[in-house]
Amino acid sequence: MAEAPQVVEIDPDFEPLPRPRSCTWPLPRPEFSQSNSATSSPAPSGSAAANPDAAAGLPSASAAAVSADFMSNLSLLEESEDFPQAPGSVAAAVAAAAAAAATGGLCGDFQGPEAGCLHPAPPQPPPPGPLSQHPPVPPAAAGPLAGQPRKSSSSRRNAWGNLSYADLITKAIESSAEKRLTLSQIYEWMVKSVPYFKDKGDSNSSAGWKNSIRHNLSLHSKFIRVQNEGTGKSSWWMLNPEGGKSGKSPRRRAASMDNNSKFAKSRSRAAKKKASLQSGQEGAGDSPGSQFSKWPASPGSHSNDDFDNWSTFRPRTSSNASTISGRLSPIMTEQDDLGEGDVHSMVYPPSAAKMASTLPSLSEISNPENMENLLDNLNLLSSPTSLTVSTQSSPGTMMQQTPCYSFAPPNTSLNSPSPNYQKYTYGQSSMSPLPQMPIQTLQDNKSSYGGMSQYNCAPGLLKELLTSDSPPHNDIMTPVDPGVAQPNSRVLGQNVMMGPNSVMSTYGSQASHNKMMNPSSHTHPGHAQQTSAVNGRPLPHTVSTMPHTSGMNRLTQVKTPVQVPLPHPMQMSALGGYSSVSSCNGYGRMGLLHQEKLPSDLDGMFIERLDCDMESIIRNDLMDGDTLDFNFDNVLPNQSFPHSVKTTTHSWVSG
């Protein structure tokens, strides 16, 4: 035949290519242009294995037959446009392979098809011309089921056709006479009219598609629901006369708050409204809340979520009653973060500074941190208002030497024991924590009792009184015998603090008992002569102190009259150089000791040294006859102390 020379041109060692995986589409074509192929098949062909003799006698014929079978199957899978452009050679090869398979491969002889040997030929591909005009058909289509439609390759959207559920519902409603149907009628129309639903009308198999019908009726705007006039009847479903959206509308889930323009507009309006409200609050500066909101650290600037956490933290130094600066803000001041080195410059101002700021409370003064630094800070104090208790006495004549907590200037911490125990001879009865009291501001250096401080410091004139919190029975001090004031007598000293706007030393719970012997070495005749000239007769002094009445929330007045007769001028010469401890002034400020001469006119001294209204703090005149009547029951009215300190009356006589 004419195709025989072309069969010879095929390589005798050519073997069928292995079929790629079925999931790949389109399948790759074998390379026919190559004369030699290095591709080998893992398994020999079935025809060659079945007929080894024929394969041995006609290797080229069997190879051509297998290649023709492979090409016939491949032609059914390939697209028409991908078909090779050499139809003549392919057709000749296929024909030669068919002839070889019919004569030698199956019958074992060289008879042609005209010899009468009838064998079932393999399925032949259509000619190249018609093949290019038809869509590709899978291998299964070559069988007897080639006429049935295939779901995967058809253009149908659903199993029943290209119509959607909405289209089917539309056709059902339009087919009715009244152009309206109930839900059950739509179900019936589906089962009767659509072949796919004919066998799915029962309740078990209709749950899925009936649910889809109800879903589409509610989803699409082209269907409207009309209330049925009859009682107990379901509603009518009609087509929307205004048209509505045809087909499927986008899913409602797609129109979320993130991508829907309606929600975006509403959010933008809400944001603008919020911004306008905030700007209005900032503009209304007259309201107190706006002033605090402008403050970055104010509670108004915090959100409600952060306010609880923010308000729970309240540092010790930021309480309303114990702020150094006097500000009643719960916010920590920037000075609270200072180190110990910086606290000194803040707490202890220079000597020239005015003492008009608010004094610290006792709870803040008794801070252990401030107690540690007091010794160093006391050495740096040069203000006249600082504590300069210098009761002179010889070391061998001290009777009782106990540390006394004395006060320093305002804005300082509570005092630690004094550094010089050979010089300070004063004791303490107790230090009890007291309730926070309203602290009054002090004036300048010359505060309420600057003159009285010097008056009590007269050399040898006053034997200072011992005072402290007394029990309700009000112990009265015994008068001091004039004979006690001898060169070797003992003088009991007391720090008396008196002022209308101040508190007693350590709030009246501490008494400084200054016991000192009176040596005869340091004598000052000038002081004694002047004192005897001014006070030629005994001056009884009635001093009202502030005791504590246990069980009562009020302060009582205990008058402790102490008769201090003036001794002989020669005896006073032995006492002249030893002035007793000056009285506490203000918030425990001690007056300076002085060795200067006492003014002859005590009235003039008080007028000169005092810068306050004496009548507002002293009910009686200072120099009323022969007595000094000090009444301080109006100091700290209705003030109660938490502890009652029992103090006995001390009296020292020469032994």
From Swiss-Prot:
Location of Phosphothreonine modifications: 24, 333
Main location: cytoplasm
Any one Gene Ontology BP term: cellular response to cold
The UniProt record lists the keyword Protein biosynthesis: no
Site (DNA-binding): 158, 165, 225
Mutagenesis or variant effect for residue 265 to R: Inhibits interaction with ATG7 and FOXO1-acetylation-induced autophagic cell death
Protein name (database record): Forkhead box protein O1
Gene name per UniProt: FOXO1
